[in-house]
Amino acid sequence: SCMIVVDTNVIAYLLIRGERSAAMDRLQQLDSEWVAPRLWLDEFLNVLCTHERTGALAPEQSVELLEDAVALMSDASYDMPPERVLTVARQTGCRAYDSQYIALAQDLGLKLYTCDRQVISKCPGVARMPD
């Protein structure tokens, strides 16, 4: 099993069970050590809020999912240097948010798993889709 960088949607699809969860299960079986920039948590909170507002999650479910996510990613969150993020955003044309994940993958020499096709098309050497 290797270490990989994952974005928030990969974490969300693993924990919020749905049609894409099976692919995330396979990914976790192959590469069980997941890391991410600290930004993942803010983005995950946003996913939970959105699901609550659409009625897809009850508040108590959100709390459980938050605990599960924090447990999954404990000691695996990195502070990203802002100038490095700017550099990657400039080089790739990706949003600063996405560039945090790309920068971390580049800096650690790891693959970034994401469901964002735009990121994959702009960074084919680093980013890939879980399948």
Pin down the residues of each PLM region.
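Contiguous, function-dense segments enriched for cysteine-driven chemistry
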Residues: 10, 16-20, 34, 64, ...
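A cross-family signal for key residues in well-ordered alpha-helices
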Residues: 12, 48, 86, 103-106, ...
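Active-site neighborhoods of divalent-metal-dependent phosphate/nucleic-acid chemistry enzymes
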Residues: 72-115
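Active-site-proximal, substrate-binding regions of enzyme catalytic domains
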Residues: 45-73, 84
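Acidic, PIN/NYN-like endoribonuclease modules and their adjacent C-terminal/linker elements
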Residues: 1-3, 102-131
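Alpha-helix N-cap/helix-start and coil->helix boundary motif
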Residues: 41-45, 82-83, 119-120
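Short, well-structured N-terminal submotif of metal-dependent ribonuclease cores
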Residues: 1-39, 51-60, 118
